């Protein structure tokens, strides 16, 4: 072993090595530790050259051709691996993003489903939800409304669409998440009605709704987003949307079989409307669009609606010769209907808040079956309406002019003020809505006897209904709807011989001290009613009013909501009652319901009921 000289790092004194002793300076006593130095031996040959040095030439290594060939292959494999990995990650992300909701989560939507399927407190099944074909959800008058049908309106033009209104005040404070509608897998029509109370969801898809043919967007919903909702855009036939750019407008061309289009909002920068002629549109609805020149190219249109327009050039309407339905609302620069002469197939005309100076172009128009004039301005109708002999529906509201006699042999549905009734001869009339709020705020039931086929009567606005007993001579009259109506012949009203459904909203009844008796009426609604007993004070306390209705022994359903009802003792004789709507009252005791053998549904939300357990388990309680 070779040794090196050691000097003390402190005093520089010479340190001598002694076997098995630590290194210690003899001068300052500093101890030193040495780390063993391990030596590695390398077996190698060293060539020594003598003489004149040769030129310094660096030898090149041989090029490895296999390695050069393999490098790009490895790079390609790495790239493909990265691409496949990224694709899988993207696919997984999309799968997560497109995961759909199989059961609604909002309480209000679940309540609606439980009710229409008679589930009581049980959750609806996926199969039941999938059976709904048509669904429209909207928030109106602080209440949720659901229009629904179990029939497909695309295959059954007569599909019955029912309306369900939520009465619970707490439920009506809630919003519905758009993603909840993913659970309705059997829908062909989904309408979110541009409603603000429906919260949009970031990750929503309706691609699994394979039969969806019609969609109405929610509030301010981007069409760029809506366009991705459908797995097969060729199935879509109806859209109600907003358009904010020409690029969004161009997306409509991806829906080759689109037949009906409603543009509920269009941004000012949108101008490329002429591309719509590439679609086979049959129905078009526009709002707040002032340039209508491009309409001339849509010669196959059968239905057109224009709402709020400052347009001044209406010549394109002359080209719409196939039009069957036309609705114009607040198109204030339109003064004449000359273009109507080019619409020989027109069946329905709806004019609201218009400044038309005359309607002569409508005279003797045999194709017209439906006419609605709402606040038509200063136009004079006179005998024009009488010349429309094919009319089946007529609505005249907000019109203060005069009319001549109207003979309408085919008219089945009419809406007009009571002063026009003496001039209306319509022997086939079945549905009549009458306004009695003007100077002649009275309607005599005897005036209705000339409509022997009348089935439904609706009386609107504040007025007096007299001659009620005459209605017994109308054998088909089964439904009466009354709004803000005053009655002095109340006993006659509640003893009508043929009426099975009576709806009274904000009605005032004058009665004597004798309770009513009725064994014909099946459905009764009383909302915000008042009763004057004899010549005494008007009574609004519901518990004093309801004993007068104890003799309605044939009732199947009864509705009294948003009131102060406390006692249910009055309905002890209602042995046929099946459905009670008593939401938002002050009921605490339901003992009187125990002996009602046919009671199936009880709506009692908003009441402080203390003894609900006494009711039969078969009664569905909401």
What are these language model-derived features?
Residues 3-5, 22:
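Residues immediately within or flanking Cys/His clusters that coordinate Zn2+
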Residues 8-11, 25-28:
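Short cysteine-rich clusters marking metal-coordination/redox-active sites
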Residues 28-39:
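Short Cys/His-rich micro-motifs in 6-15 aa windows
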Residues 60-89:
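Alpha-helical transmembrane anchor segments and their immediate juxtamembrane flanks
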Residues 92-123, 139:
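Surface-exposed cap/linker segments adjacent to membranes
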Residues 134-180, 186-205, 211-226, 235-248, ...:
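Concave beta-strand-loop units of leucine-rich repeat
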Residues 181-184, 203-206, 230, 252, ...:
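Hydrophobic anchor residues at the C-terminal helix/turn of individual leucine-rich repeat
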